[in-house]
């Protein structure tokens, strides 16, 4: 149910220190402690595949064992943030993909040097490129959820105004891709950092998504402990922006 008081009980996007970009103190015990303080009932630990190409399954299993040893009184999923780095281009093979418990896919990490770019580096071209990646990813069955969808904030060094990317996506195009997600049981992340960066689009995503009965989850994309925010704080912020 897409009701903010329910959605904010969970945080589906938390990195441990197996992600190079995360703080060293992002350990499983510390994360769980902070999540409990924040009033969360469910969290997902999702480290980047591109930081752990050769050891992804080994490291996710290591984290699973840590969680089992702690036996927390909140629900902790160990998944991964995986890469759809181009049209039909994926960072892990199908066998590895199937062994990940929660497959949070990023399609717009354009700041990474291996990511595919459209031939023309314009906002409409990036919008079209991202939509095509998403369409193919969704029908592939690889993804459980899409991380920070559509937003162009990883294009800050290329576009003068990264919000032009989402403005280049029509309401009909947005509805169509969200409906495709519904048909293939793919959820979409309400990524708080993306919402703060592009609030006008966030309102469109929220409105149209609810119209087509999209499944949303909330993630703070936490790389530091303080980014595992209290659920009441997140609810207040999102209610203000999305209303």
What kind of feature is each model-predicted range?
Residues 1-86, 95, 156-168, 176-177, ...:
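An N-terminally biased module of ancient metal coordination in phosphate/nucleic-acid-related enzymes
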Residues 44-45, 104, 147, 189:
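Conserved beta-strand positions in the central sheet of alpha/beta enzyme cores
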Residues 180-212:
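Glycine/small-residue-rich hydrophobic helix-like segments
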Residues 197-200, 225-229:
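Short active-site-adjacent structural elements
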Residues 48, 148-151, 193:
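Short, well-ordered beta-to-alpha junction loops that form the rim of enzyme active sites
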Residues 55-183:
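Extended substrate/RNA-proximal surfaces in nucleic-acid metabolism proteins
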Residues 34-35, 137, 181, 209:
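Generic structural signal for hydrophobic
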